[in-house]
């Protein structure tokens, strides 16, 4: 199973909105077929592995084999036929599954179907490692929203910029290059209008070989983005704006952006948190993304938007690149209100630490949410 999980990593950038899945077929102690899920609408991992095995040996030789799959095979018709039927047709003796699929269209049905066909099924093998491959897909199935990961580059004293806003560059080139991988695996790279106006970023994937670019999205309540912004380079851009009637000038601006810049304007209601309606409802933003089959959201934003997602309890993971620098007075990663008691602090759990060049990459996540997803795939 560990080998199958490693194989699934080769599909890290291409499967969305489907999960990243790999399958190994083992016969007489050796791997005779392998495959991983391709782009949406193409073969899933099980079908790829079966085709690979049949290219090496007679189809009848698959009878009695063992299938190792990182996710329960699908049991429904979508862009492709059900994989469980292809597996059953091979008449394996055993199917070993890393995790159950919480998708309501599957949800254990494939396991039951294989057992009814006389196949021994084992599940829950390296489930947490398999979950780490697909936090976005599992989150969308279990919590009805994508997995949101905030990427932060900071100094040892947790400053993301000088007091005047200068931030290029706190971290070194190796850390910045490593960050491209996390953009590439995401479905959406999200930022706020403040970052766009201050830095004019591209927010695209560079220095990583990938067949697709994630959608770039901007929280822009007042719809003040410059039509000449660098991120309008032909690839899709989604703009989340306040749900209100646009002025005539704004309507013309929207038409130009849609027709000439491949942009989409998405109207979102204002938040009513704490009785104030000054910002977009970020839960509505996340619901829209989930409805559009977005699995992983990569947030690269300033202190205020970081704080807004954290306070809305929507930040699932923090990816922090810490440079061995001490800045002193400067801008914090989160523009949070002061706490009255330490017990009010938002608690996350570190799960990975990695030296990247001269900097350190720290990864922390919401442990409660992670455990809820782990429980859903282990039932």
Where are these regions (language model features)?
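Active-site ligand-binding patch in enzyme domains
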Residues: 139, 143-295, 304-307, 370, ...
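Short beta-strand scaffold segments in enzyme catalytic cores
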Residues: 21-29, 152-153, 362
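Residue-level signal for inorganic ion chemistry
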Residues: 4, 22, 74, 114, ...
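Short gly/pro/ser/thr-enriched loop/turn and capping motifs at secondary-structure boundaries
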Residues: 102-105, 128-129, 197, 224-226, ...
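Zn2+-dependent cytidine deaminase-like catalytic core
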Residues: 25-27, 31-129, 245, 308-310
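Conserved histidine-centered catalytic loops in small-molecule metabolism enzymes
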Residues: 337-379
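Short, basic/aromatic recognition patches
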Residues: 1-16, 140
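Flexible, gly/pro- and Lys/Arg-enriched active-site loops
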Residues: 311-348
């Amino acid at each position: 199973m560990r080998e199958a999980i490693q194989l699934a990593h080769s599909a890290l950038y291409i499967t969305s909105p489907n999960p990243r899945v790999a399958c190994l077929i083992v016969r007489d102690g050796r791997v005779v077929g392998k495959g991983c899920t391709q782009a949406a609408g193409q073969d899933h991992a099980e079908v790829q592995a079966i085709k690979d095995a049949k290219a090496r040996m007679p189809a009848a030789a698959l009878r009695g084999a063992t299938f190792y799959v990182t996710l329960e095979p699908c049991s429904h018709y979508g862009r492709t036929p059900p994989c469980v039927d292809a597996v059953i047709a091979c008449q394996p003796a055993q199917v070993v599954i890393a995790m159950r699929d919480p998708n309501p269209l599957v949800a254990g049905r494939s396991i039951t179907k294989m057992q009814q066909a006389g196949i021994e099924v084992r599940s829950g093998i390296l489930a947490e490692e398999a979950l780490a491959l697909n936090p976005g897909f599992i989150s969308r199935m279990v919590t009805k929203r994508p997995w949101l990961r905030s990427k932060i580059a900071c100094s040892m004293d947790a400053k993301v910029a000088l007091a005047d806003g200068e931030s290029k560059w706190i971290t070194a080139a190796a850390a910045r290059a490593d960050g491209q991988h996390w953009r590439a695996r995401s479905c959406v790279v999200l930022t706020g209008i403040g970052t766009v106006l201050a830095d004019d970023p591209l927010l695209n994937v560079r220095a990583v070989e990938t067949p697709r670019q994630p959608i770039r999205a901007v929280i822009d309540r007042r719809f003040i983005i410059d039509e000449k912004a660098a991120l309008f380079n032909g690839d899709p851009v989604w703009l989340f704006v306040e749900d209100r009637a646009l002025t005539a000038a704004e309507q013309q601006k929207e038409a130009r952006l849609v027709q000439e810049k491949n942009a989409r304007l998405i109207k979102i209601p204002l938040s009513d948190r704490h009785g104030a309606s000054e910002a977009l409802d970020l839960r509505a933003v996340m619901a829209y993304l989930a409805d559009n089959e977005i699995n992983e959201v990569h947030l690269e934003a300033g202190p205020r938007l970081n704080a807004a997602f954290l306070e809305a309890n929507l930040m699932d993971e923090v990816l922090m690149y810490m440079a061995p620098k001490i800045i002193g007075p400067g801008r914090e990663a989160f523009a949070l209100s002061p706490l009255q008691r330490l017990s009010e602090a938002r608690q996350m759990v570190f799960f990975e630490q990695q030296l990247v060049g001269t900097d350190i990459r720290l990864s922390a996540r919401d442990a409660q949410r992670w455990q809820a997803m782990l429980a859903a795939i282990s039932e």
